[in-house]
């Protein structure tokens, strides 16, 4: 009886440790992600798939959300704002239906938008303010992203220097469009009063 308990204990440890160690050698997906994709693709259905069906349909190994999150922390993987509960080592993100995309072998929501300090972006609100200030005559060559993503980007860029009130626009290559409403460029971000706070 004791040997049975020991075998069960070893199997439990292996079940939790092995997926974490092998996460970036194969593709995995969580139950929560499968549920979200199913709800998005068939909103009126209460379909739940068994583990073997998920593996067969997706080509990905089922893993718990806890193990995935622990593995991401241990491997120092960061990308977008929200991990989508799926890796993309060999197989593209199934959660792309939910707005997720692949970065550093992990599917993230907003992973393309988050490194915004590498390209020029502006929020709809900032663009609208600029348009109102100059009578609607402007050519926008910046990528439009949500205010929430822009704010999260400021937090995720640890090397970023704050100075003034962010005007919801970056100025990596293109000057601040929001200069029309009193903003200026500092550390790749347009700020109101950025010169006064230097």
UniProtKB/Swiss-Prot annotation:
Disulfide bonds join 84-100, 88-102, 93-107, 167-183, 171-185, 176-190. Probably participates in a plant defense mechanism. The presence of a 'disulfide through disulfide knot' structurally defines this protein as a knottin. Transmembrane segments: none annotated. The lineage of its organism: Eukaryota, Viridiplantae, Streptophyta, Embryophyta, Tracheophyta. Belongs to the cyclotide family. Bracelet subfamily. Residues 1-22 form the signal peptide. GO terms for biological process: defense response. It comes from the Eukaryota. These are cyclic peptides. Keywords: Disulfide bond, Knottin, Plant defense, Signal. This is Cyclotides mra4/mra5. Residues 23-79, 111-163, 194-198 form a propeptide. InterPro entries: Cyclotide, Cyclotide_bracelet_CS, Cyclotide_sf.
